[in-house]
Swiss-Prot record:
It comes from Chlamydia trachomatis serovar D (strain ATCC VR-885 / DSM 19411 / UW-3/Cx). This is Probable outer membrane protein PmpE. Belongs to the PMP outer membrane protein family. InterPro entries: Autotransporte_beta, Autotransporte_beta_dom_sf, Polymorphic_membr_middle, POMP_repeat. It is a peripheral membrane protein.
Amino acid sequence: MKKAFFFFLIGNSLSGLAREVPSRIFLMPNSVPDPTKESLSNKISLTGDTHNLTNCYLDNLRYILAILQKTPNEGAAVTITDYLSFFDTQKEGIYFAKNLTPESGGAIGYASPNSPTVEIRDTIGPVIFENNTCCRLFTWRNPYAADKIREGGAIHAQNLYINHNHDVVGFMKNFSYVQGGAISTANTFVVSENQSCFLFMDNICIQTNTAGKGGAIYAGTSNSFESNNCDLFFINNACCAGGAIFSPICSLTGNRGNIVFYNNRCFKNVETASSEASDGGAIKVTTRLDVTGNRGRIFFSDNITKNYGGAIYAPVVTLVDNGPTYFINNIANNKGGAIYIDGTSNSKISADRHAIIFNENIVTNVTNANGTSTSANPPRRNAITVASSSGEILLGAGSSQNLIFYDPIEVSNAGVSVSFNKEADQTGSVVFSGATVNSADFHQRNLQTKTPAPLTLSNGFLCIEDHAQLTVNRFTQTGGVVSLGNGAVLSCYKNGTGDSASNASITLKHIGLNLSSILKSGAEIPLLWVEPTNNSNNYTADTAATFSLSDVKLSLIDDYGNSPYESTDLTHALSSQPMLSISEASDNQLQSENIDFSGLNVPHYGWQGLWTWGWAKTQDPEPASSATITDPQKANRFHRTLLLTWLPAGYVPSPKHRSPLIANTLWGNMLLATESLKNSAELTPSGHPFWGITGGGLGMMVYQDPRENHPGFHMRSSGYSAGMIAGQTHTFSLKFSQTYTKLNERYAKNNVSSKNYSCQGEMLFSLQEGFLLTKLVGLYSYGDHNCHHFYTQGENLTSQGTFRSQTMGGAVFFDLPMKPFGSTHILTAPFLGALGIYSSLSHFTEVGAYPRSFSTKTPLINVLVPIGVKGSFMNATHRPQAWTVELAYQPVLYRQEPGIAAQLLASKGIWFGSGSPSSRHAMSYKISQQTQPLSWLTLHFQYHGFYSSSTFCNYLNGEIALRF
């Protein structure tokens, strides 16, 4: 027997920065281990009378099994009177399936007036309740009691606790006739500290004239999911009210896995319309809902209700401090496409740690018998409907986070206040955007948030972009920035008529024009508009409105509220570029002449230049009669357009974008090639011809200090080599090597991982009968590199890139061997050399955050002239050995520092970097030891490097040679 289970696949997690829409949820089948190997015939693993259990402790059993049990009383398999505990059931788990009762508790139940508690905890194996039913399909009168309701398709108890279980817990395809398709408790249902996933799927309860609440769960007092370590799934559950959960109080707090409410639904009453309303496609609560402190992703997707709240119906909602949260494609027939709030206490929705996104949530407005809506009230997008008469709605976002509404919200009562980013630490963005509205639905009803409620912005950003419209009666900005992007509309309107009317009022302090959004191809400039008053579809300009721009600071920003000069292409000059439109009832009604433009030309990174500004004014002719104006767009006669002119003057990248890391890769290549050229094979002339093979390992460490305002780096290399040697009077060697390198930028996590493949040839000439030794060395190296950049200052973003490099080098050394005092064991040799390196890298483009492209403008060229002395000591025992010590001064004769052209793709700004150069003067050293244990076997060890005011380099090489 295999029980059907599932997992879900979700697209890439959002960081909370981008205006993105997440992927949909995909469900796929997966199998769960059998709870038991026993037969699936009519069977129960418990012996004795299971229908009158009092203080029953079922501890440490191998398994618990109840299949195809039937009873005319409460609890088809188990009936309890006081307390029932399933504790420490072993790995075959707990399995209740296909049990049936015409009363309450399809598997486990109780009879009044008892009030028992059920506890399932510390189970090792899976806990499965499947296909249990409490349903009375015919009228049946118990002669000893009144007709009873039928609730709890799987479990009916006063209190239920499911805690500390180790394997999956699943309630699937359970059915009740009244409430709690899977679980019904008169008081409390608690799920806490479970280690594996928790599943409610395909549970259902249908409506009677008594109730019809909770497709999966009904709790009479409270329901909580706390501190669970894995995922919580609510899939395909159905009921009249609360498609998955119905409870006065519901909380999901401190859970570490993902939380998914998918395709739950509230259908229409089947018996009477006077019963519980069909609200809350996923959750309906009558007091409050708390979703706080959860670390995984939260999805409310494709939930449906016949009435209010496509996903959630609640008097009070607290949705704060969670992982990425998405409300996608939820549907309500009347109001509240995703969330419906109708209480008078404060509700709070805040994207504190990750983004919260509302997208494609719909109010269908179906009224016709054929399931369609009227043309006067067609379907529309709606994220949240607030029907409260008083209270406060708090909407906010933490630092660098976004609360994004791709669907409008509705606050219908002026007694409710709406506060954006009220708390001081809420410095993120609350975004109204029409970016996901397709052309077929591009209508004001899907773009406009219109409310008589007073709105206040205290901190952070209130963003209106991509043709979204915010129409208010009263709006006050005490802090933060009102960001206006492509096609944004911020307007005010007079609410009501006569003496009870509330005049329009908007007070702003700081407007940020989203430069990258306004300048993109096909974009429209934002609009500030005093809406005319409407009297029987005749429109009159509202001269009484107060919409003040006096002393308002105007600045230019990007999508994230930052300086736009590194995210916008300002390569070319802009002449009289329209940036903001104003439509007003009287000349200078908005006092736009007094806007503070001092924020335009401030010091910044990115494109440098100068902004100048001016206004283009137009005035429509006065109509013959105001009664003839039937188009609200034509009621205002006075219009202004802000024109900005930009004169570019170069580009200065910010430190986080400069990235000396790529140029430092060439410096690393140069250092590795330099030490490889100095890594002599210690060839010596021989009295007879010979040839041989060599092989060995190498390691290198470099510490480069910061130089010229560039951070230094640490480099570690290791690898191996193999080659051949041959010769007599003159010798020749050829060596191939592969090295693995990790270059880390100092004081940062940025790094480059490399593989270098090298070929090196060496020739030694003995001239003037050994008086002069001349060595020629050549090298070619090819490198594969992977770079990683980390943006850690409040962003936690990364970028990656792959590129190649080529390095060529050559060296010549002249030695003058001398034997002081006629000794045959001691040799000294002054030497002079010249060593040149050329290195360049390929063009490449990063992927990830702030992508850039890099290419070599000028390659790195470095020429050294080492001059020094070496000394050798040799013995001629049966195991000949030679020790060599070398000390040299190596100045740079010529250097062309690398010029790496970097371009930030968002702004198309280009700059050049040379990395962190090493000092031009250094002292090098070398110690080597060579042993010949056999006539045909030579062991060779070398340690060398150099030290300068900027760089400390160490190179270690061990090699074995077989001569024939």
